[in-house]
Amino acid sequence: IIYLVYLLQFLHISNRVTLTAGTVGPFLLVWIWKRRSKIPGVIEWVLENVERLLSGERGKKTSLVQLRGTIYRRFFRGKRKQWLNVLLELAVMGAAIAAITYVYGPNMIEAYGYKASDIPVHNYWINELDRNNIWVAGVYPYGFHIVIYYLHMVFGIKTYVLLRIFGVVQTYFVYLAMVVALKMVCKGRFTPYLGVLFYVMDIFNRNTYARFEGALPQEFSMIFILTSVCMAIRFFQEFAKEQKAEENEKKELDQNCRWYLIQFAIGFSLTLTIHFYSTMIAGLFCIGVAVGFCFRFARWKYFRRIMATGILSVLLSVDRKS
């Protein structure tokens, strides 16, 4: 989305039609290309069922019963234990979401304000994107502004409304990133959620979390700090497995390693694209990962891939600012 908005802004053709087409078009083309041999049969099946429904050959109740049966067979039959496990985890996650909403959400109801003095400036910059006037006040990391502008332009939500409620939404994702990171280092199934519940408790210095009540670029970029670090850790773990794996397993493990590196590059570049302070934090985490895996990091086969990915992530973010 960020690259798409940058491209359309530079061409001065950014609007709801071009943004929607640029978002849906590539996925639709890929979907059609992959399923091009099955599409005629699917269209014929849909038209046949619609015709039978409209002609009265098949009643509405019969169609609904068949649809319900299809959904049951695909998602529920023989999966009772799986759903029980999922529901238990969803209940714990729901408690965490409720706690986050209780701590960070009252602003939406009680004050309905911006909660930070610099948000009106960001609001002005986002409004200028409506006029295809990017970087109206100089070059600045515009990742956050582009996301708000995209939501405003495509879905028709007023910018000032988004800036008043988006702070809680982005905080959900920050904590979700924390859950993912804790799942990597904790053996207990519910320990990550307990860690989130402990952190969200209102027992710390208010200055440590007050800014999360507002929609701010620096806090938004924190979503990508832990995610990029997690991908770096997973690369080292997966690459070690690849070196010891059988030949028939190496190809799949190598693809996993490449995918982790790509995600690391994207995550790290997004921190710089959104706010450079978060890049400093992510850099410190990366140094910690390098120290933790120092014996592997120092080997050329690890080092060259990590360095190439790091340079690529910086170039991706710099390219967005050039």
Positions of PLM-derived features:
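Membrane-interface junctions at the ends of membrane-embedded or membrane-associated helices
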Residues: 7, 32-46, 74, 232-262, ...
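Hydrophobic core of alpha-helical transmembrane segments in multi-pass integral membrane proteins
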Residues: 21-34, 91-101, 313-318
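Short hydrophobic/aromatic helix or loop-helix immediately within or flanking a transmembrane segment
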Residues: 136-159
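Conserved small/polar residues in nucleotide/adenosyl-binding loops
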Residues: 321-322
